[in-house]
Amino acid sequence: MKGLKPLSLSAVLGSALLLNAVFSFSAVAGLLEKGRSQGLTAGIANEQPYAYVGTDGKIVGANVEILRAILEPLGINKVELPITEFGSLVPGLAAGRFDLIGAGLFINPARCKVIGYSNPVTRSGGAFLVKAGNPLKLHSLKDVAANGKARLATQPGSNQVQEAKDSGISNGNVVLFDKDTEALAALQADRVDVVYFPDAEIIGLLKKAEGTPVERALPFEQIPDADGKPTWNYHAYGLPKNDPAFIQAFNEQLAKLRASGDLLKILQKYGYTENELPPADVTAEQRCNR
């Protein structure tokens, strides 16, 4: 899943009409009942590290493992994972083409008008990739600006370019690459000092850079919002809006999975860190009403 892909308001509102007009079996009988008797379908978008086709042809990913760990204690042992385009996930759930969204999806107030959400599973922000040992001690955009000579790599047209500018990094110290792998190569060749991308991309780059002297800069200070608090996006599962019993049961199992430590263990298998866990008291309702 690429959570930052926008879904147009017209598409969202159009889906809302579908939601009101189309009621699948799952919406009538409830997903708990349907899941236990028939199994469920969870739409995915074939994107790493969330839910994707592995080298053996099986669908794997952090979201797939977490989903099964939530559903199995509820007596739901069969889950089919149809692949669709990312932009078709919300309309597909609204139209009843599948029972829930198994790919991680940013909680977005516009989408909240159309679908329900689980409570957040992970959070996403920016991240730095640096040379091993982080020789320049770069843990924030402010650190790069204060250094004055550190060269930061990112992609043209991305939010990261504006964030670098807003943080006081001079244009001459921002080096743009069309592909994240090109930015990684520049870091490895000492042509830049730090690579700045959303954390999911940094996690992917780390896997590609395995065996080379680069690392993720931790801790990392996120850019502040208007209230001076760190800016985060929150991933969750998309659930049917008109099935509160299922949403409650899903969230209860998610909370148990987190409290046991098993949620973090699954995430760590895919390159996540504890930094990607949202605060336990952040809820979908809060994010929908912000």
Please give the residue ranges for each predicted region.
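Extracytoplasmic small-molecule ligand-binding "clamshell" domains
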Residues: 30-104, 113
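Alpha-to-beta junction loops
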Residues: 41, 76-78, 95-103, 148-151, ...
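Periplasmic-binding protein-like
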Residues: 45, 123-127, 210-251, 274-290
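Extended ligand-binding regions for polar small-molecule ligands
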Residues: 61-74, 134-135, 150-151, 158, ...
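Acidic, polar ligand-binding/catalytic clefts
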Residues: 68, 79-144, 220-226
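Ligand-binding clefts/hinges and TM-proximal coupling segments of bilobed small-molecule sensing domains
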Residues: 80, 159-174, 248-290
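A ligand-binding cleft/hinge motif common to bilobed small-molecule-binding domains
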Residues: 88, 104-113, 163-166, 193-231
